[in-house]
Design a protein with these regions (language model features):
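Metal-dependent phosphohydrolase cores
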Residues: 1-181
């Protein structure tokens, strides 16, 4: 599925900031598989639907101007399902997962647990992809540098605290010290 020429075309289209549509779908497929397998659900269908849930093959940012489609978020599940059915044999669960992955933006709620999971993993992956982009925009030298600079401003330049605990990594203290001083 991931090597199908039609699926590989998703690499050409940006999706969330710098993440391609292909990478986003791969992320969703991975988390769908892991979560559904953990709960003893249909992990294979979850992974397949995750890989195909955004198979719309256009840059959605300019789509409205070109087509007049007012709300991409509400219409792209139908486009993705149409494209997926054209190239792949889908079961009913995979169809539902692709069609309802945008709930609550799309009005019909999911019927199966796997569909609820793709709804949540899609939001989670999208949030992480956007957050990762803006983290690098807002903190180009890393959050460690930002926190160390903030601590020095608040507590004074002579304050020495060796461990700034950050959930998203850190740079070496020598590098940060050179950038702050």
């Amino acid at each position: 599925l991931v090597h199908h020429p039609y699926v590989l075309k998703m690499k050409q289209y940006p999706h969330h900031c710098e993440t391609s549509c292909y990478q986003h779908c791969l992320n969703v497929a991975y988390f769908n598989y892991r979560i559904c397998k953990f709960f003893g659900l249909d992990a294979r269908s979850a992974a397949r639907a995750g890989m195909l849930h955004d198979l719309f093959l256009y840059d959605w940012r300019g789509h409205r101007k070109k087509t007049g489609d007012p709300v991409h978020a509400m219409t792209h599940p139908h486009t993705a399902l149409h494209n997926a059915k054209k190239y792949f044999k889908l079961n009913k669960l995979e169809e539902e997962m692709i069609l309802k992955h945008m709930f609550p933006v799309t009005p019909v709620p999911p019927m199966h647990k796997e569909t609820w999971i793709i709804t949540l993993t899609d939001k989670y992956c999208g949030t992480c992809e956007i957050g990762r982009y803006y983290y690098h925009v807002w903190f180009p030298r890393g959050a460690y540098y930002f926190v160390k600079r903030l601590v020095k401003k608040v507590f004074g330049s002579d304050y020495e605290y060796q461990d700034y605990h950050l959930p998203f990594g850190r740079i070496s203290e020598d590098t940060a010290d050179n950038e702050v001083n």
